[in-house]
Curated annotation (Swiss-Prot):
It comes from Clostridium botulinum (strain Okra / Type B1). This is Peptide methionine sulfoxide reductase MsrA. PANTHER family: MITOCHONDRIAL PEPTIDE METHIONINE SULFOXIDE REDUCTASE (PTHR42799:SF2). SUPFAM superfamilies: Peptide methionine sulfoxide reductase. The keyword Oxidoreductase applies. The active site is at C10. GO terms for molecular function: L-methionine-(S)-S-oxide reductase activity; peptide-methionine (S)-S-oxide reductase activity. It catalyses: L-methionyl-[protein] + [thioredoxin]-disulfide + H2O = L-methionyl-(S)-S-oxide-[protein] + [thioredoxin]-dithiol; [thioredoxin]-disulfide + L-methionine + H2O = L-methionine (S)-S-oxide + [thioredoxin]-dithiol. Keywords: Oxidoreductase.
Length: 157
């Protein structure tokens, strides 16, 4: 099994979208690559902790490759917009690919480079090693499964 953490705006939609993909075996939402240890949702929303709302993904690479997974990720975000996805604004809504395995970096860079060909503006999606990931509060986990029709900036149909 492989792992990656993806930030694509509000984590509810990213988790719901990713959880529907064959080969993804586990998802969790949380706060990635900030400066405060174990922040609350309210603290992250204040914009002072440096965290991105993100989705931890465990996947079976014999079913879905990292390249395929990233192609799906690119399809649900606007990677040229800084600190905004859909109606959500703030540093916590930035886009990012946070890797746990250094060996994944070449695939990520190649994927980002390929995706850049689809845009005139530069892609601003962060590509960094995962420095920290704090699981979000329970009510955020599988939020759109528990609350069908809840807010989502991603078209899930």
């Amino acid at each position: 099994m492989k792992e990656i953490v993806l930030a694509g705006g509000c984590f509810w939609g990213v988790e719901e979208y990713m959880s529907r993909i064959k080969g993804i075996v586990e998802t969790k939402v949380g706060y990635a690559n900030g400066i405060k240890e174990n922040p609350s949702y309210e603290e992250v929303c204040s914009g002072t902790t440096g965290h991105a709302e993100a989705c931890y993904i465990k996947y079976d690479e014999s079913i879905i490759s990292l390249e395929e997974l990233l192609n799906k990720f690119w399809s649900i975000i606007d990677p040229t917009v800084l600190n905004k996805q859909g109606n959500d604004r703030g540093t916590q809504y930035r886009t990012g690919i946070f890797y746990l395995d250094q060996k994944d970096l070449n695939v990520i860079i190649k994927s980002k480079s390929q995706e850049q060909k689809n845009y005139r503006k530069p892609i601003v999606t962060e590509v960094e090693p995962l420095k920290c990931f704090y699981e979000a509060e329970e009510y955020h986990q599988k939020y759109l499964k528990k609350n069908p029709g809840g807010y989502c900036h991603i078209h899930l149909d």
